[in-house]
Regions:
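Active-site-flanking segments in enzyme catalytic domains
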Residues: 1-179
């Protein structure tokens, strides 16, 4: 039961294969987070992609970080997605991967912060985007959070190894993820 995920795409399709892959990855991220979180997928006390995104969508009207125009766009996106939070996330994820990665702003501040935290770009993309003042604060915050996690994990791993434990490849991969 511990096998890698597999994605099947049609050989012949009317849509662009790259867009189809990005859309599928957005759905996958949402569903895997729901599966991992279990019944807490929507509970903001358990911080996760789905819980923070649901909180953002549910309470966008009261969110002071959103302008009136941004609130209207969220309302329209929610109506277009037939009140499906997953579909709103997938559309934002597509914009994140397609446009925001190239430096073109399509998302509001709140959605961007959630996606930076849970769906970060590769280091070279982040370095290019750091030139832009819109991204500097969120990437600085991400780098600080990651540095804190690296420090905590390194201390934990050192303590574990000192007690005679062995660090598995999965734990090393986890550490590398935060070092990126």
């Amino acid at each position: 039961t511990n096998t890698p995920a597999r994605f099947l795409f049609p050989m012949f399709t009317a849509t662009d294969l790259d867009e189809l892959m990005v859309e599928t990855m957005g759905r996958y991220r949402w569903e895997i987070c729901r599966r991992i979180q279990g019944v807490y997928w929507n509970d903001i006390r358990e911080r996760s992609l789905t819980s923070e995104y649901c909180d953002y969508i549910q309470f966008y009207r009261k969110n002071s970080d959103l302008s009136a125009d941004a609130k209207e766009k969220v309302k329209t996106a929610l109506a277009r997605a037939r009140n499906s939070y997953r579909e709103v996330f997938v559309k934002d994820y597509i914009s994140w991967m397609k446009y925001e990665s190239a430096g073109s702003f399509r998302l509001n501040k709140v959605a961007r912060e959630i996606l930076v935290r849970y769906c970060p770009f590769a280091k070279d993309v982040r370095v290019n985007l750091m030139q832009n003042p819109q991204y500097q604060n969120v990437f600085r915050k991400l780098n600080a959070e990651n540095a804190k996690k690296v420090q905590r994990l390194t201390a934990m791993y050192d303590k574990y190894e000192a007690a005679g434990g062995e660090i598995t490849p999965e734990l090393n991969e986890n550490l590398k993820y935060y070092q990126m």
